[in-house]
Amino acid sequence: MSETLRFDPIYSEHAIERCAWTVFFTQPLPEKLYGNVTQAAGDGAQERGFQPVAFRGIQFNAITGQVVSGQASGGPVEFVTPDGAQQLSITPQSVSFASTRYVRWTPFFGQVSDLPLKVAERFVDVVSVSALKVEYWDRFIWSGEWSDFDPNKLLRGDNQYAAPGAVRGGNAWHSHVGWFERTEGAVRRLVNINIDAVDFLRPNTIGPKPSIGVYTTIQDAFFLPGSLQVDVGIEAIKTRSTEIHNDLKSLLGQIILDDMQSRISLNSGARADVR
């Protein structure tokens, strides 16, 4: 019986629950320019079927003492598709795009280039890029129960990124590791890996199943206070984004077993086009 138990990716061709791309800037845009940028971004987003998300807050009039609800100027702006699967977020100091409808990197980054990157270009005309981040959330579902849960059927025995004490726990657990490293073309790189064993409820199923979620992210910093700054333009952001994506693929390959890598075609076949 135990030999039939296994992990399955959340989707038939890949395990990606969510992917996100974010570019950060060294300082916020001036308020008036930020308003112009978000207005243009909103028009473009709604042309593409996105809907604005209303942020409600409280504003205080120092003269009259009146407290009113509403959104303060210069605050975050967000647009989502009607099904909530895709999200464009803009703040005075960042632009982010996320999707739970990930198919493969090329169309995902095509969507980034279609609008979010154009918004970022308006920022780059005025302020410098401080960092670029790409994130992946992968999910694998256990076919059995917690009583027979075996993370060793997914995670490599020689992987350095899951705390041994957590993996031996047998029940729900969390492992987190992160480090800085040097990388060419940036001031420094931050790598983070979270591995969680938790209940997961699939749509149209009865009761949750044990699962392992693997969150991987790489953030390249191009500016740090007191250090040198690396000038980065839009074309460099495009190239760097794909480089980070490929490095994250390699990182996942160091975490999961070869059998699962083959099932999701991580580095060849369909997966090469998917991820």
Give the ranges of each region predicted by the language model.
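Short, solvent-exposed segments of well-ordered alpha helices
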Residues: 8, 99-103, 231, 235
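Short glycine-rich, low-complexity/disordered patches
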Residues: 51-63, 121-139, 167-172, 247-275
